[in-house]
C-alpha cells in the first residue's frame, strides 16, 4: 500500500521545518524593537512641548500687528473685570501686562483736561409760547374759510410731514411699505404711531434707517425710536430719545442700601425707557467682591438736583470723568476733579469719554471687548442711549470696544458721548419689557443685576 505524502517531498518538508525553527530566533529581535517605542513617544512629546513653548513666547512677545492687537484686547478685557483678571495674570508674563496697561495710561493722559462745551445756543427743546401777530386789516371771513377748508386728509398730510421731520433717520420707502402691510398702525394717525417689535422674542420690523439699521420700535407720541446695531462679535440697541428734557438719572428706592432692577426703577418713575447708569461698589456685607446688592454708588451721581456718593479719584490707571446734564438739557463732560456745575440737574461718573465737541477720542488702547452702555447727544440735541450685549460666548457675541461705540454714535451725529457702567450690569428696558440680554446666564432674561440708579426717559405727561 503506497504511503501518503504530507509535504510533497523531503526538501519542502525541510524548508518548512527550517522556517519553524527560525521563528523563535526572531522573537528576541521583536522585543528589542518594542523597547525603542517609548523613546520615540518621548521624543514626539518633547517636540510638541517645545513647539507649544515657542508658540507661547511668540504670542507673548511678537510685534506682529495682528497678534499684538488681539493680545492687547485679551489683556485689557481680562484686567477690566473684577473676577477674571487671573486670565491675564496667570497666563501672561507681568512685563507684557504692564506694557499694555502703561499704553492705556498714556492714552488716558492724551485726553488730558478736555472739557466739553456748546458753541452756540441750543434750539429750544419745548414749544415756545405763540407770538401774538400784529393786527392787520385782513378779511376775517377769508381766514375762517381757509381754516374750514382743512380736510382730515390735509391734517394727516401735515402730521405725516412732522413725523418724518422728527424721525429724520427713517428710510421712507421701507416705512411706507410697512404701513401698507400693516395699515392698522395709522388707526390713530401719524402723530400717534406706536410700533413695538423690540422684545426678546420679537424679530424687529422691516423698517430700516438710512444708516442701514433695523428699526425695532417707534413711538411718535413719546418721541422715541429703537434701532438694532450689530457687527463683528456684538449686537445691541440704540435708543434715540428726541426730547432731552425728559431724560433724568433716577435712583432705586433703596439707594445707599440696596439696588433695584433697571425696569423697576423706570416703572417707579413713570418711564418708558431706561438703561444702566452709575457703577456700584460690588461687595457684600461679608466682604466678598462680586456679590454686591447694587445699593452703593461708585463715584458721584446727581438725580434731579440732589447729589449722591463720593467723587472718584483719578489715578494713572483710570482717569475718571463726569457726565453732567444741565438745566438747558444739554450734556457736558469734564474730569471728576472739576467742580460740579451750579446748573447741573443730573450726573454720573465713569470713563472713558469717547466724543467731546464732535471729536472722537479714538485710540488703540481702549479695546477690551465687553458689554457696553454709552450715553451721548446729537447735534439735534437728541439723547442717544446705546447698550451692547456681550459675553454670550456660545453665540459668538463677545461685546465690543468703546471705539466701535463711537462709530455707532457718530452715525447719528453725536457731538458728546461717554462710556458708563456696563459689564454684567448692562441693560435696557423699554415699554414694560427688557430688550437686552444680560451677560450673566442666571439673570439673562430677567433684567440682569440690581443697580443704584438708571437713566430714565419719562413718558409724556397727560
Residue ranges and their predicted role:
Residues 2-462:
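Gly/Ser/Thr/Pro-rich low-complexity, intrinsically disordered segments
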